[in-house]
């Protein structure tokens, strides 16, 4: 995994160092902090504003951060802890003009199981991500070649999860169409296709 963020502008590097500090302040058993997504791939959008169909839109990439801990936390506990880190990061900043931070968290055991099972989201993070902090107490698993049965199980699991969600969005789109709520209908159709 990469470790350098030197290709980023100084302000972005400072932001990422501050994010690491803020996480470590509130989460002492943090094992790794990994930048993934557009900033890790250097495909980020700092700020894009345009007018589409007469509507002004703007877009900024956010910092996607994976926080790895040595224990599995209850969802509400880790969300509360990471929201404190987010609040600390924004102190003294214009929250609406700053690059936003999106945290996800995993225990080291769950992350290594996901990498071992070739779960694409996590293997992409390992391949493209940048290690911002590493306690050195754990190592990330290596991808292994799955046998046919494992590939089939993984594909069925992805399909069942995605297909159910896509059907939920499609159902909502049909209700929206019947109620002549076409904007939200188009959104739900888009979500159905994306899943």
Which role does the model predict for each range below?
Residues 2-11, 88-171:
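Conserved NTP/Mg2+-binding pocket subregion across the NTase superfamily
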Residues 31-45, 49-52:
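Short gly/ser-rich loop at a beta-strand->alpha-helix junction or flexible surface loop bordering the NTP-binding
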Residues 185-195:
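Hydrophobic alpha-helical packing segments in soluble, helical-rich domains
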Residues 170, 177-178:
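Hydrophobic/aromatic side-chain positions at a characteristic register within alpha-helices
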Residues 2-26, 46, 53-115:
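Metal-dependent nucleotidyltransferase catalytic core
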